Amino acid sequence: MAKDIKFSEDARRAMLRGVDQLANAVKVTLGPKGRNVVLEKKFGSPLITNDGVTIAKEIELEDPFENMGAKLVSEVASKTNDVAGDGTTTATVLAQAMIQEGLKNVTAGANPVGVRRGIEKAVATAIEELKAISKPIESKESIAQVAAISSGDEEVGKLIAEAMERVGNDGVITIEESKGFATELDVVEGMQFDRGYTSPYMVTDSDKMEAVLEKPYILITDKKINNIQEILPVLEQVVQQGRPMLIIAEDVEGEAQATLVLNKLRGTFNVVAVKAPGFGDRRKAMLEDIAVLTGGQVITEDLGLELKTATVDQLGTANKVVVTKDDTTIVEGAGDSTQISARVNQIRAQMEETTSEFDREKLQERLAKLAGGVAVVKVGAATETELKERKLRIEDALNSTRAAVEEGIVAGGGTALVSIYNKVAALEAEGDVETGINIVLRSLEEPVRQIAHNAGLEGSVIVERLKHEAVGVGFNAANGEWINMIDAGIVDPTKVTRSALQNASSVAALLLTTEAVVADKPDENGPAAVPDMGMGGMGGMM
């Protein structure tokens, strides 16, 4: 296919037009008085959102050169979202400011390579200073503040703070759509896996259709149980002790299943069988997790163990087990705490080594089940459109909170970026490197300027006053007051601000050093005409 090529100034100007179109659509959402953007959907109702990365991903421009510029800034938003989970609008605003200022200087004769070195030098100093003014997050109130600022909703802040307190830093918090109007929190205590009873006749509560076992023995195996004779010796030992039993196996079927159900209905003993969770190697790992949690052993041929020789000592125990048709929950497993923490550390090490995002997610789930817990935030709203928008905001808030726990917090509302202005301005350089530093300095002001602009105020006046205020003091655009941002709970996670600055500078520096852009030429003939299917002689059809 023929290519269209643009060079130097033409190329950079075309890309800047694309950058501006995307950034202008995204930056209206910044700050407490930011607006929403409506996105057309081919199917269903439009999506109304103020999430920067969601808007950026939707934008496709007709001109291929402009589209390339837009896609570069979209990547800034996506990368920031991947690393920190929030701050995508801030990253877009920073990138636009750096690109605009940079192109002005390159057009005026500055050397792009020198400018790039200046940008990199300034950003490195800015990140060091951000870390220096960062404060660790300690209390539940601080967590609630971070989540409330990100989502723009205090109730969401409290909900996420409670979820994180209940499940801990190793826990998993998932966000689901609720059937009702209210947004609520559901926390699963203990280890839960998505396998239910193999027969409904095993339930102990026929109203709720669930089986509740108090202080049961737990047989864990990766084998199929077809013949009751295989587990009869260990069953007899459990019956003698008068305690219920949970069997976790690859499957329980045929004569074994029938015998267990019959004895359960007769009241001889209380037993529930469930299928083992997961598949393949993941199943083996999850069974081992259950064994460690309950203080039992996995009866498997890999270890030379057989069901018919199993004893009560090899079974796990727990305070309580609840089994429904879909899930099994083990509460307060009786495993040794040192073995559990060793297993947790082993999973953490695997998480650090793996390069697969899917594997990391599954390892995180296993870690949560062993060390923390699982919390589900059920999002409710009056309409589907509001539900989607609310869900996106809560996801942002959750990501922000995790980032804050990881690297601490700085003053919000763009204040932190202006607080480090003087330290970056003190860098010594000359020529084009100095120009690069000045480009970063100008961009550090831009988030505050945009937040003020969205609130209907003059951004430059706010920025100038902010430069002379004490560290941490900033402008609250929600009510127009000058306050200590951290004391007022207007905070941003350090990781979010850092990622936004790093990713924006990376793409800006690359775009400034671009000298040629190559794109496909549009097909002037348009799509090929559909051939006549020879249906002309069928005029008599009704």
Curated annotation (Swiss-Prot):
Q: Which domain of life is it from?
A: Bacteria
Q: A GO term (biological process) for this protein?
A: protein refolding
Provide the E.C. number(s) assigned to this enzyme.
Answer: 5.6.1.7
Q: What class of enzyme is it?
A: isomerase
Q: Which UniProt keywords apply?
A: ATP-binding, Chaperone, Cytoplasm, Isomerase, Nucleotide-binding
The record's region (Disordered) falls at: 522-542
Q: From the UniProt record, list the reaction(s) this protein catalyses.
A: ATP + H2O + a folded polypeptide = ADP + phosphate + an unfolded polypeptide
Q: Does the keyword ATP-binding apply?
A: yes
Self-association state and partner proteins as the record states: Forms a cylinder of 14 subunits composed of two heptameric rings stacked back-to-back. Interacts with the co-chaperonin GroES.
Q: What does this protein do?
A: Together with its co-chaperonin GroES, plays an essential role in assisting protein folding. The GroEL-GroES system forms a nano-cage that allows encapsulation of the non-native substrate proteins and provides a physical environment optimized to promote and accelerate protein folding.
Q: Report what the protein is called.
A: Chaperonin GroEL
According to its UniProt entry, this protein's organism is Listeria monocytogenes serotype 4a (strain HCC23)
Per UniProt, what is the name of the gene that codes for the protein in this document? groEL
